[in-house]
Amino acid sequence: MMNGLEKSDPAIVAVKPANKGAQSAPAEWVEPRAGTKGNTDQARTQRTQSRCSVSPGLERVRQAAKAGKKVKFTALLHHVDVELLEWAYFALKRQAAAGVDGLTWQAYGEDLHGNVQALHRRLHRGGYRALPVRRGYIDKGGGALRPLGITAVEDKVVQRAQVEVLSAIYEEDFLEQSYGFRPGRSAHDAMDALCVGIGKDKVNWILDADIRSYFDTIDQEWLIKMVEHRIGDGRVIRLLRRWLRAGVLEDGKYSVSEQGTPQ
């Protein structure tokens, strides 16, 4: 349950059952004070936060996610503060095409602090609304075209900041063999791991597979349900729904799909 737009519930931990004959009720997890010390998995921290200094709050989230795979976080949006939003802006590609509002990265940055302050207020007061995605296409070769969703700069800023928060949780869940769309990892890292595996073990075959139109066919409701296993902050879930349902603008025509996510 949410207490209101201005406040999230405290994070909740689903604790393991006690010894036989006793059952533990779900416990309430409260973030310790910023000065609390603890051992850190430095390698994973570097992967998770390599492009942003680790804030004490997100580090505590990461540690809680690492300690309990069934921890459900109900207080996350407050981590998206002005500082993180400004960092997210500088993490974006400078030369990316403008979205439906025609605003470029450079134009948004002319009054960056003022824009981010206003965005922060709308975000935490429930006034933020995602703009439709502008549809573009890129050549895949052989005459095939890949649809590309071009998001407005301000939406990109919020999304990039939210990714940083969610990565503190999900980087503790992902398998070491996973390389796609993860911070500090690339296709070259995957190839290096493959080369090591081939050289170390006897390999008879390699499977190269691809899911056709993967992003275009994702079931949005199932995606939300999967996220809700870990994320219990209703405001974060509402943000995800707004982005999924923001719609697409192509050749002046607006449409909303109940499946798929913009690329």
List each language-model region with its residue ranges:
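Nucleotide/phosphate-binding loop and acidic/charged catalytic motifs
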Residues: 162
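Short loop/hinge segments at the start of secondary-structure elements
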Residues: 155
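Phosphate/adenylate-binding "loop-and-lid" substructures adjacent to NTP/NAD/dNTP-binding pockets
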Residues: 83-93, 102-145
